[in-house]
UniProtKB/Swiss-Prot annotation:
Binding-site list for substrate: 84, 197, 273, 336
Sites carrying sugar chains: 105, 255, 326, 357
Record's protein name: Mannan endo-1,4-beta-mannosidase A
Cellular component terms (Gene Ontology): extracellular region
pH dependence: Optimum pH is 5.0.
Keyword Secreted: yes
Role of this protein: Endo-1,4-mannanase, a crucial enzyme for depolymerization of seed galactomannans and wood galactoglucomannans.
Molecular functions (GO terms): mannan endo-1,4-beta-mannosidase activity
Main location: secreted
Signal sequence coordinates: 1-18
Compartments where found: Secreted
Temperature-dependent activity: Optimum temperature is between 60 and 70 degrees Celsius.
Organism annotation: Aspergillus aculeatus
Catalytic reaction list: Random hydrolysis of (1->4)-beta-D-mannosidic linkages in mannans, galactomannans and glucomannans
Gene that encodes the chain: manA
């Protein structure tokens, strides 16, 4: 998801005690999530799973706030939470704002301090405690929280698309991947490592992203062969049941089926935003089933990883959930995005957010999870 602006000021949320990362050996299970044919397996159960997104949880500065979210997810039986594993800056903040990596003058500095990766440490620790599984990505296509452009700016590349091929940038990117993966490679709370949030390479030959995906996923597997790896793309570039609309074309440099066939990619992802893409809401059902068919053909499960609208959440998104749940090849969905109320106020609302214990939450979480559980019996 591309955010329209910075939605969360974290300097004012209090300061938490941040300790060096240590695994929580009291986690609900030590079994790592995996795939089984066209399905996911979590905690020994193979099937379809519901979840959500929270880009902001790793930027909270109060541990109690993180625990509140995780406890609500666990109580709601939302098994998977996708979080931002990046927070790139070109200038070091001085106001207490959380940041993970500084890019400046051709160098990159990883922040492992209390206002850096120790905040992500606590997200993993809390996820272990509450039995939630995390998808952690490493960089953003968009400029929110720095993104690829932060690298491009610091290393003097000509265009954002150079991120994928610039040797110095890729070395810094891989160094960050190594830093994050090495912190959590022993944690059963990790569902998957994700190359990026919505990677695109507009106007590029599809070989550019294919080669980058192949190389990066192979590198991640060399660091951690036990966890799943995925791309984090929107599902663009698909010739299965194509209606010729832009998302099906290769204009963003992606070939969904070919990329999914890479041996070091364990499952596929797709996103769904008709309001942003200029398509109808009903169009989304075909988008889901087309990807399900592609996933089935490749023999790997796919995850409807992001989907959202700004109004009429239940009426619009519930049919998508039903379509995904009934489609062979799709094994889970994560709505965008989770919302809750803290002691200091509500979590960010980018327009797609709906909040815990509201009528939309009942429709799209409580009822949805109940339907999944009923179907799996």
């Amino acid at each position: 998801m591309k955010l329209s602006h910075m939605l969360l000021s974290l300097a004012s949320l209090g300061v938490a005690t941040a300790l060096p990362r240590t695994p929580n050996h009291n986690a609900a299970t030590t079994a790592f999530p995996s795939t089984s044919g066209l399905h996911f397996t979590i905690d020994g159960k193979t099937g379809y799973f519901a979840g959500t997104n929270s880009y902001w949880i790793g930027f909270l500065t109060n541990n109690d706030d993180v625990d509140l979210v995780m406890s609500q997810l666990a109580a709601s039986d939302l098994k998977i939470l996708r979080v931002w594993g990046f927070n790139d800056v070109n200038t070091k903040p001085t106001d207490g704002t959380v940041w993970y990596q500084l890019h400046a003058n051709g160098t990159s500095t990883i922040n492992t301090g209390a206002d850096g990766l120790q905040r992500l440490d606590y997200v993993v620790t809390s996820a272990e405690k509450y039995g939630v599984k995390l998808i952690i990505n490493f960089v953003n296509e968009w400029t929110d929280y720095g993104g690829m452009q932060a690298y491009v700016t610091a290393y003097g590349a000509a265009a954002q698309t150079d991120f994928y091929t610039n040797t110095a940038i890729q070395a810094a990117y891989k160094n960050y991947i190594k830093a994050v993966v090495s912190r959590y490679s022993s944690s059963a709370a990790i569902f998957a490592w994700e190359l990026a949030n919505e990677p695109r390479c507009q106007g590029c030959d599809t070989s550019v992203l294919y080669n980058w995906i192949s190389d990066t996923s192979k590198y991640i597997k060399s660091l951690d062969s036990k966890h799943l790896v995925t791309i984090g793309d929107e599902g663009f570039g698909l010739d299965v049941d194509s209606d010729g609309s832009y998302p099906y074309t290769y204009g963003e440099g992606l070939n969904f089926t070919k990329n999914l066939g890479i041996s070091t990619i364990d499952f596929g992802t797709l996103h769904l935003y008709p309001d942003s893409w200029g398509t109808s809401y009903d169009w989304g059902n075909g988008w889901i089933t087309a990807h399900a068919a592609a996933c089935k053909a490749v023999g790997k499960p796919c995850l409807l990883e992001e989907y959202g609208v700004t109004s009429n959440h239940c009426a619009v998104e519930s049919p998508w959930q039903q379509t995904a749940g009934n489609a062979t090849g799709i094994s889970g969905d994560l709505y965008w995005q989770y919302g809750t109320t803290f002691s200091w106020g509500q979590s960010p609302n980018d327009g797609n957010t709906f909040y815990y214990n509201t009528s939309d939450f009942t429709c799209l979480v409580t009822d949805h999870v109940a339907a999944i559980n009923a179907q799996s019996k």
